[in-house]
Amino acid sequence: MTRKYTKKSSGSTASTTNSTAEIVDLTTSTSSVGKKRKSPDEKAQPITKKALNSLTPVQSMFEKYKGKNIIKAIHYTYLYTYIFNVHLDDDETIGPEGIARFCSDIGLAPDSFEILVLAWTMNASKMGYFSKNEFSSGFEKLQCSDLSTLKKQLNSTSQKLKHDSTKFTDLYKYAFGFASEVESKKSVDLGTAAEMLKLLLPEGPHTTNFAAFLCTQPNKSINKDQWLCFLEFSRTVKADLSNYDDSEAWPLLLDQFSEWVQQEKRI
């Protein structure tokens, strides 16, 4: 909008040419009083991992669960934290004693298949120990509102795994590293391997014999290739070994096992 103000000259009422002072245009620009439009570079950018780390715990929680049921998310977060703190053995970890108490609370044995499934879901790195991050990650995936629901979920997941060969193979691979006590995770003690196989493949056609065979070996450990090949061996070779072919690319350990079974007449 333009407003015109007229200033009269001092001495006369006169004519248009000498009585009319300069006309001043005062223009109010909408761009000067309105909100400044942001340039494309100034528009809000997604929160990066670095920026997320600088947020407060509450801000981080809201960012993490953006678009989800935040009340439910907060409930789960506090539930996981509470359960973890109740079973702590030190400031950061639930150890063997804490896991024993935790298993007692949900009514499952520490050496049960269901607890192995829980460890797999948590991606726990060491047998007998759960870190806070592992614990919260596993519970978040399972989305359980109480310990009773957790037990039901573990039972259900365990049954499904037994009928899903792909996911079971993932669990079987995970179990090797989980059971390994060496830093490289390249081997597992024979006694531990035997017990883990009984847990994973209790009805396998060769599990009982192979566990017994391992206890007779001079070597003290089994490597990952031998471990993985035994799963394939269990799936493809008949209990009586009638279709076993020693010319195939089986590890030497499995050739020796086949000979041992026949010599010991354990078929």
Swiss-Prot record:
Q: Which domain of life is it from?
A: Eukaryota
What Gene Ontology terms for biological process does this UniProt record contain?
A: protein neddylation
Where would you find the membrane-spanning parts of this chain? none
Positions with biased composition (Low complexity): 8-21
Q: Where is the stretch described as Disordered?
A: 1-48
Q: Which GO terms describe its cellular component?
A: ubiquitin ligase complex
Read off the PROSITE patterns from this record: DCUN1
What's the name of the protein? Answer: DCN1-like protein 2
Please name the source species.
Dictyostelium discoideum
